[in-house]
């Protein structure tokens, strides 16, 4: 189900034992600007509440539903958490806040409270979806919450065998480890108004795949009609609406990143899952480099 309200309200979570929350994951059924305007309060007795944080929505376009949103908060230990909402103070809609143009109505599918540190609004910062969010604050993710490079071991070369029967064989130093498996695949977005050419979106970082799509769709106008007339009539191709979601990886992304940014991204790969590394300042800088590389690759194509 979905929690809905047009009037001031709050959602309350109660735990049997004190729980330490470090971030809040907001799950929606569609796009809802109001769900990211919650005021987070905490209490030890369910009577006296203290302010934890006023959530701030990321700047966003209309195609904002591919990923959830994770808001980091100062580490807070409490038995009761309240999430207050009011329509008062809502901003008007704009090109970079499309969802705000609708009448203020709160719609939330889930609120997930997590104890592990994550970068603020990391889903947009890693390029999974177009968003522009506030930087993570040190009071929310401290140095002690960040993994250092010495704590990360790349086990890829120890993962052997065929695709359907690979085996990981590794000897790790003593301690408690987390196994993080990362890969890449299509986002599932398909091209719209494509007629018989409908299918998965092509790799926007690869000039060859973009050229193949162009030659077999738009450029067919030169093949199917009189070429001389087509050359006089069709002089430009204008993209008036980007409706293919986001892309943040392909087979050559790590290579292009190192060539353009001057350092290896692979040791910092956990950042692409929102896991803070070294420091919040360093984490934000590297993810800014990721987004810059994404932009350059699309432009270069």
Predicted regions and their residues:
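Aromatic, loop-rich ligand-recognition surfaces of beta-strand-rich domains
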Residues: 1-49, 53, 67-142, 241
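Short helix-terminating capping/connector loops at secondary-structure junctions
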Residues: 227-234
């Amino acid at each position: 189900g979905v929690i809905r309200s047009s009037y001031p309200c709050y959602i309350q979570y109660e735990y049997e034992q004190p729980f330490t929350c470090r971030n809040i994951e907001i799950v929606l059924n569609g796009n809802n600007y109001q769900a990211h305007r919650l005021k987070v309060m905490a209490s030890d007795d369910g009577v006296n509440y203290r302010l934890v944080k006023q959530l701030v929505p990321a700047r966003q376009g209309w195609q904002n539903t591919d990923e959830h949103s994770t808001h980091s908060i100062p580490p807070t230990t409490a038995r009761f958490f309240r999430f207050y909402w009011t329509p008062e103070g809502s901003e008007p809609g704009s090109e970079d806040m499309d969802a705000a143009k609708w009448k203020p109505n709160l719609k939330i599918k889930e609120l997930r409270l997590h104890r592990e540190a994550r970068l603020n609004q990391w889903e947009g910062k890693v390029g999974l979806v177009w968003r522009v969010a506030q930087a993570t604050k040190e009071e929310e993710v401290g140095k002690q919450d960040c993994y250092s490079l010495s704590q990360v071991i790349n086990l890829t070369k120890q993962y052997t065998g065929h695709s359907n029967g690979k085996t990981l064989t590794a000897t790790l130093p003593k301690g408690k480890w987390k196994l993080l498996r990362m890969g890449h695949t299509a986002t599932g977005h398909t091209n719209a108004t494509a007629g018989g050419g409908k299918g998965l979106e092509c790799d926007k970082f690869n000039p060859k795949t973009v050229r193949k799509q162009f030659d077999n769709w738009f450029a067919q106008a030169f093949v199917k009609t009189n070429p001389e007339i087509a050359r006089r009539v069709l002089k430009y191709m204008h993209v008036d609406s980007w409706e293919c979601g986001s892309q943040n990886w392909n087979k050559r992304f790590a290579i292009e990143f190192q060539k353009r940014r001057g350092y290896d991204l692979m040791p910092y790969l956990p950042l692409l899952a929102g896991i803070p590394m070294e420091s919040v300042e360093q984490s934000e800088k590297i993810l800014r480099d990721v987004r810059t590389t994404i932009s350059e690759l699309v432009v270069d194509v």
